[in-house]
Every structure is written in structure tokens, then in C-alpha cells.
Amino acid sequence: MLSKQIPLGIYEKALPAGECWLERLQLAKTLGFDFVEMSVDETDDRLSRLDWSREQRLALVNAIVETGVRVPSMCLSAHRRFPLGSEDDAVRAQGLEIMRKAIQFAQDVGIRVIQLAGYDVYYQEANNETRRRFRDGLKESVEMASRAQVTLAMEIMDYPLMNSISKALGYTHYLNNPWFQLYPDIGNLSAWDNDVQMELQAGIGHIVAVHVKDTKPGVFKNVPFGEGVVDFERCFETLKQSGYCGPYLIEMWSETAEDPAAEVAKARDWVKARMAKAGMVEAA
């Protein structure tokens, strides 16, 4: 029987670094999480996961089965380095190849959702041509994802092109495909001049997962929970009242901390307390 509890997960980069997924999932289970989100970022080490052998992929699947902790989503931020909007044809082709490999990887290991970074370009200057190429790249990517039955979900970003749900919804209407949805980050959403609650309500029906972190205007990473501008309780209440029942993912970058598990446990308790106040979970 499926649980009726709110699924709460932890980002891979919050946990100690390394390539042993059995250990990572065991730790996540000990910390009380339902799932872990995998990172495939722009570093060569994490990009190389897309070239894992059959045996390596099977080891991940076996770790999931053994622990009961799922890996249902991938944060694919590698497109910062290889953007779909690049005016360099070779770089853009590499970005599309990364997308193809990520979708194949997801299909092989049971990942359901690939979170996309909403950058047309990141290290270069954006213009109308980079945005056109980005749109075309998304269209090609969604066609690949449709065939694999893998959902691509756009993150609300630390970047003006995709800094609100309203803007991201423009892409859902443009692509008009059930395999392209939204994966908002309530931290990023709150750091801009957005009506956060209205934005969350506007996205209902397209939101497949939610990133949970704190932010300040212009500061999008490593803001301790409770020290930023995010009104977590109101965000959780809005999502609950709007009928959202999907997963929440605590996003942290504590993998190099002196005691990552302690940092994560502290954040988990803080977030769950706000969820309890919003009537989403029972108070601990």
C-alpha cells in the first residue's frame, strides 16, 4: 500500500561525497528521508555517470531495492557548461547529447523526473538567438523524453529568463507536451520580486516536485534555514490548499561540511516543523 505521507527527500550534495550509492541511500534512510535526488552537474566526475556501464547502473538499482530509498529525480545542471542556447554549434550539440544520455540513464535506472536548469546560456551573453536556440533545444529534448516516458521539469532559477513560474509556464504552453512540467524552487522564487503565493497557485497542475531552500535577494545558495526571506509556512499552506501532494526536496550543499549528517538532520527538523505548522505533517 502506498504511503499517504508527504514524500520528503534530500539532495545528493547535502550528503558526504563519494560514488557508493548503497552507503548514500543507507544514510538517507537513517536520516528519515524517502528519496535522494541525484546530481549530474558540469563537473567531469558527475557527468561521467551518464556513461556508467550496465553493471554500475544495476548497482544503483540494487541499492534502491535493498534500502527502500528511491532515486526518482535527477538535477541536471550540466547544461550550464554545455547550454542548449549556445551559439557554438559544437557546444550545443554536446548539450543535446548530454540530454539524450540523461534520458537514457533515467530510463535505465527508474528516474522519473529530470530537473532542467533554465539557462539559455550561462557563461556567455544572452540574446534573441540564444533564446531561440534554447527553445528549439527544449523542443528536441521533450521529443526524446516523450519516447522514453521520462518527465523533463523546469526549475525556477537564479537567472532572469526563468525566475518565475509565470515565465516557465510560457514554455509549457509553447511545448504543449505532458512530458514537460515545472519543478519550482521556493527559495529562488522568493529571492526575486515575485508574488510567491500567486506564482505557486498559477503552477498547480504543472508542478511535479518542489525544491526547499532559503535565500536572500541575490544570494541563492548556502543560506541557513530561517536566515533568509522565504516564508516557508505560507508556501507550504498554499501548495497544500491548492491540491499539491507531490514530493519536497531539501536542497543543501553540505557534502564538504565537517559533519554533513548533522547539518542535514538540523535542516530536516527545521523544515518538518514548518510543514507541521502548515498542517502537512504531524509535529515531531
Swiss-Prot record:
Pathway assigned in UniProt: Cofactor degradation; L-ascorbate degradation; D-xylulose 5-phosphate from L-ascorbate: step 3/4
The keyword Hydrolase appears for this protein: no
Database matches in InterPro entries: L-Ru-5P_3-Epase, L-Ru-5P_3-Epase_Enterobacteria, Sugar_Epim/Isomerase, Xyl_isomerase-like_sf, Xyl_isomerase-like_TIM-brl
MF terms (GO), sorted A to Z: intramolecular oxidoreductase activity, interconverting aldoses and ketoses; L-ribulose-5-phosphate 3-epimerase activity
Listed Pfam families: AP_endonuc_2 (PF01261)
Enzyme Commission number(s) of this protein: 5.1.3.22
Keywords attached to this entry: Isomerase
Gene Ontology BP annotations: L-ascorbic acid catabolic process
Enzyme class: isomerase
Domain of life: Bacteria
SUPFAM superfamilies on file: Xylose isomerase-like
Catalytic activity: L-ribulose 5-phosphate = L-xylulose 5-phosphate
Induction summary: Induced by L-ascorbate. Repressed by UlaR.
NCBIfam families named among the record's database cross-references: hxl6Piso_put, PRK13209.1, PRK13210.1
Functional description taken from the UniProt entry: Catalyzes the isomerization of L-xylulose-5-phosphate to L-ribulose-5-phosphate. Is involved in the anaerobic L-ascorbate utilization.
Family membership noted in the UniProt record: Belongs to the L-ribulose-5-phosphate 3-epimerase family.
UniProt protein name: L-ribulose-5-phosphate 3-epimerase UlaE
Source organism of this protein record: Escherichia coli O17:K52:H18 (strain UMN026 / ExPEC)
